[in-house]
Amino acid sequence: MSELNFVVDREKCIHCGKCSDDCATGIIEFDREGFPLVKSGNEQYCMKCQHCFAICPVGAISICNKKPEDSDICDNNLPTDEQVLNLIQHRKSIRNYRQENLDKATMQKLKDMLKYSPTGCNNHKLHIALIDDIEVMNRFRNRTNNTIKKALLSNKWLPVSKKFEKFKQQFIDGKDVIFRGAPHMLVVSVPVTAPCAPVDPIILLSYFELYAQSLGVGTLWCGFAEIALKLIPDLCQYLEIPDGYKVGYVMLFGKTDLKYQRATQPEDYDISVIEPHEIFPATFVDKVKRYFWNALR
């Protein structure tokens, strides 16, 4: 038994090799009898993705103290491609919310799905700050808005005042410019050392949004809240974001009375379908331009 607790039930194993074929780091080998194993010293390379565990057709593999009998079975009861596309086409950014909490059952479903969001290299170390109570949200909302309003009136806190100067009068008038009256909020932060730090929070929130909207819950990607969190340290402390983590992005959510009657008609993106051709070296000028564009935010 290794540090990973990679265990093979020899009574069940059919020697199909699927666990080894699907191992992302290629550390699953076979002993002389054809049973899979992870050699001592290779445990450190395991991503703990559990693919070997999931793909075994007979449930012969346990890893990381996970037992196959404790997992749901994939029954292929998936939505059709038309149903998935319909969900994508009809999702909308919601800026008008009921002033009430989600029911506990719906909130629990949303919490439970978060762990299934993939992360780069299966880092799986995101921090999620969840406000699931409207009273807590209102306290956070008021603190944020009052801090920004004070900065705008004094013109002393330049990073904050510059970012929100355009909305100064709305803050003065008490408008909820940032949070749009949302009763709930999800803030995803990521370790600064994570291999795919920029995208991991976005992946999680993309999964969260589609699942939330399938439950009739409105969502909003909130760049203003992300800016506020990055400029006002008190807010990060309130959300218990650990040291060594940076705010990735923010999503607001809650029930809404808005009912959209049809899908929008967005313009197509510019898609370059690449045909077979030689790859020629870029000129010096083209290299400089590309380095410049890739380095921008």
Question: Model regions: which residues?
Answer:
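Acidic, surface-exposed loops and disordered segments
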Residues: M1-R297
